[in-house]
């Protein structure tokens, strides 16, 4: 053996080669051990994780089943309450029986889901059932819901009315949370109208209220919708404005000192021969455009002796750059635009309810231009209506104003001028006949209540009023119009009427 060993030739390169091979084998051996360890660990983790997630999935599934069972129990209780409510339903609530045609299904299922969400939200706010209390462990988990069901009749009543309101006003909401918030806004307004209408005829109240397309607005949305009227600098007024009496004297209609005592007791331009049905500005703050275009439409028809024709409010929104589009404006600047450009037909430049990036008036035929802008003082309104016709005015629109449904408005007004409308007439009526106007569609029961409430008063007292055309569609107010209280001379400035009055001169 020693002889064999002695015969081996141990060169330096050979020794180095053996060392390298040995090192390589050791490294590979360690790698193999690590790989095996990692593989075993991964397999173990995978197995453990699979077992865990499988068990967790089972737990979640069981929780989901429990939650679904709980929700079904709660909705079953709600359905019982709803059925009891249906037994005492009146004509106003018949909508509960009708199908609510939208993607979410029929009215009853939608109503139940909304009531369930509402009830759950209320339960979270005032939780009288402590589930962590040992003494409550064996109590039915629907206890807290049944505890609050006694008060659900009112919610069912208001919710059924809200669903009817949604359908009538084509309301669609993003999700149930928004729908519940809109419901709360609606309920506040609905209760306000009911309380107001109970008092109609008392304390001088001569108008009734009703929920409408704005009744689901929040207070912030109300404030954003009504923008302060843009002011007009004196240099523009002096350049373009012609005072009413000067205009009438120039056209030989009257002498400059003509007095209002010569005028009739009433003047009404609401006839179909003067106007198309009132239009709807939608959620765009473009009342100034509708007032100005409405004024121009009357002037165009009256001057040319034609039937009513619709002109473009959208052109004013897009092209009258002195105004702020859907963020407010002033009819004066719309008339100023008409002086320099002309007006498009409504069919050629239709209303969109929002401001476009570009003015597209090159696409339409520009018809008659305005040459000057007339100005009316507060004590000249009756004179203006008799000699030149309708005029644009500004009012201080308030929540009372928005909820107006019929009668002669004498409610609270906003001290700030924030809404442009068209003054189309004036009149007077005995107090007992305040709701007998042919344009009024007030419920006969409210008229009866009004007459009962004014008993003992001097029902022969005369109520004087303005007739105003709004831009909230024909379903608002009295066919799209509102009658606003005034004094006999028409110069009291109630609700801002008379503070900012213009008309176009053709």
Curated annotation (Swiss-Prot):
The active site is at 287, 419, 470. Coiled coil: none annotated. It is an enzyme of class 3 (hydrolase). Cysteine protease. One of its GO terms (molecular function) is cysteine-type peptidase activity. One of its GO terms (biological process) is proteolysis. Belongs to the peptidase C1 family. It is found in: Membrane. Glycans are attached at residues 133, 258, 418. SMART domains: Inhibitor_I29, Pept_C1. Residues 1-262 form a propeptide. The gene is VP1. It is a single-pass type II membrane protein. Disulfide bonds join 284-326, 319-359, 344-364, 413-495. It comes from Plasmodium vinckei. Residues 54-506 are lumenal. Residues 1-32 are cytoplasmic. GO terms for cellular component: membrane. The keyword Mitochondrion does not apply. Keywords: Disulfide bond, Glycoprotein, Hydrolase, Membrane, Protease, Signal-anchor, Thiol protease, Transmembrane, Transmembrane helix, Zymogen. It comes from the Eukaryota. Its EC number is 3.4.22.-. The chain crosses the membrane at residues 33-53. InterPro entries: Papain-like_cys_pep_sf, Pept_asp_AS, Pept_cys_AS, Pept_his_AS, Peptidase_C1A, Peptidase_C1A_C, Peptidase_C1A_papain-like, Prot_inhib_I29. This is Vinckepain-1.
